[in-house]
Amino acid sequence: MLPRHHEPIAAIATAPGRGAVGIVRVSGRGLTALATALVGRPLRPRVASYGPFLDRQGGAIDRGLALHFPAPHSYTGEDVLELQAHGGPVVLQLLLARCLEAAGEIGTDGRPRLPGLRLAQPGEFTERAYLNDKLDLAQAEAVADLIDASTEAAARSAARSLSGDFSRQITHLRDGLIELRALVEATLDFPEEEIDFLQRADAHGRLARLAERLAGLLDTARQGALLREGLRVVIAGQPNAGKSSLLNALAGAELAIVTPIPGTTRDKISETIQIEGVPVHVIDTAGLRSDEQAGDEVERIGISRSWQAIAEADAVLLLHDLTREHEPAYSAADTAIAQRLPADVGLIHVHNKADAAPEQAARVAARLAARQAGDAAGVVLSARTHDGIDALRAALLARAGWHAAPEGVFIARERHVRALRAAATHVTAAQGWAEQSDSALDLLAEELRSAHDALAEITGSYSSDDLLGDIFGRFCIGK
């Protein structure tokens, strides 16, 4: 019996539903006999051949293009057969079933044409590409990220990762760590030599440069992770502060009902927008007030869901009504809401209705301009006239830590950020040991090894089976 990752696999590679074209993909070793049975003739490598796809009796299931990519010059690194038919789900299912049937039939040589052919698991074609060194792990993840990209910037960043930009930078850092570790090991292995390998190699300077490059790569990875994951933003505040109007202004569409009646919004409403290519998932919530003030049970449930959304948010836009901020009770309620927010949430105070209270708006704007470093960000705007909306967009990106031009960013995942952070921690520790006497060289070497291993996890040079299963299990079937 073949190992699982050597078994031939087949799947419909195009998305479910109706379309002009659908693709059935087969990957394995030795597909010539299967291809001949399906199309009735030998296929020339890497040349599209048009004709019928045949059932067991020789009748046509459909007509389309067949392509054979012999190993190793294919997506998976194995022999690959692609059948491009009309994109109806029934046709594609019939074609896939015929592939499985024909694989088990006895060929002219007296043996099954492709024994063991089975349906592919999600992501298994890309997993084969990784296992056969066609892609590293970061590139394999970029395939899924390119498919899932929700903005143009995210798609272009994923394409850069798929082309190997991210991996090349990781490899360059790993090579530097290996070279420096070799010098440390040489000093440990040949203590009798009158050569200070580390001093001659400028170990301190190398470590400083490695730390600097790691810091830059970590910052870029954070930008890439933000492009991939997006920013989850909750609009919160008291009833009638203008939350739904702000959602409409940010989205550029009338998504939420706006009335002067308190409690109009009973449940959360969400919309994904783009700000400089960054996906921002904006959630409008029910107005926050005490259970005693809530009009009925439905509103109380809506308020509870608002707090739940806040707990899961990356940032909160806390709305203040400029026409009522001078009222002690209203101001006290705003303060109570702010104090209840999670300590680690990105908070932006949004002072709304500047068009209705221009003098108060000017006073608040002056106060915000004089705020100290570390104070929560604040914006004065009018959701009705859209004045100040651009400033709010900029404040949101700044709060999220976005400062890069999308053209220079590669897509990244949270696990990449964690690995880079771990590597940076180990390099910092190595710098500390390098300042010590020669008795600390073994500890220096260990920190360099740990930093290298952390980076190796990104490209898959060192990966656990559990990690691989989690990554490829998130792909669609047929990819």
Swiss-Prot record:
Cofactor(s) the record lists: K(+)
Cofactor notes: Binds 1 potassium ion per subunit.
GO biological process: tRNA methylation; tRNA wobble uridine modification
Source taxon at top rank: Bacteria
Residues the entry annotates as binding (6S)-5-formyl-5,6,7,8-tetrahydrofolate: 25, 82, 134, 479
Keyword Cytoplasm: yes
EC number in record: 3.6.-.-
A GO CC term assigned to this protein in UniProt: cytosol
Any Pfam family: MnmE_helical
Enzyme class: hydrolase
GO terms, molecular function: GTP binding; GTPase activity; metal ion binding
Alphabetized UniProt keyword annotations: Cytoplasm, GTP-binding, Hydrolase, Magnesium, Metal-binding, Nucleotide-binding, Potassium, tRNA processing
Entry keyword annotation includes Ion transport: no
InterPro entries, A to Z: G_TrmE (IPR031168), GTP-bd (IPR006073), GTP-bd_TrmE_N (IPR018948), GTPase_MnmE (IPR004520), MnmE_dom2 (IPR027368), MnmE_helical (IPR025867), P-loop_NTPase (IPR027417), Small_GTP-bd (IPR005225)
Binding site for K(+): 240, 259, 261, 264
Binding of Mg(2+), residues: 244, 265
Domain TrmE-type G stretches: 230-401
Cell compartment(s), UniProt: Cytoplasm
HAMAP family in the cross-refs: GTPase_MnmE
Subunit-structure text: Homodimer. Heterotetramer of two MnmE and two MnmG subunits.
Job description of the protein: Exhibits a very high intrinsic GTPase hydrolysis rate. Involved in the addition of a carboxymethylaminomethyl (cmnm) group at the wobble position (U34) of certain tRNAs, forming tRNA-cmnm(5)s(2)U34.
PANTHER family (alphabetical): TRNA MODIFICATION GTPASE GTPBP3, TRNA MODIFICATION GTPASE GTPBP3, MITOCHONDRIAL
Family, similarity comment: Belongs to the TRAFAC class TrmE-Era-EngA-EngB-Septin-like GTPase superfamily. TrmE GTPase family.
Annotated protein name in UniProt: tRNA modification GTPase MnmE
Species per Swiss-Prot/TrEMBL record: Leptothrix cholodnii (strain ATCC 51168 / LMG 8142 / SP-6)
Lineage of source species: Bacteria, Pseudomonadati, Pseudomonadota, Betaproteobacteria, Burkholderiales
This protein's encoding gene: mnmE
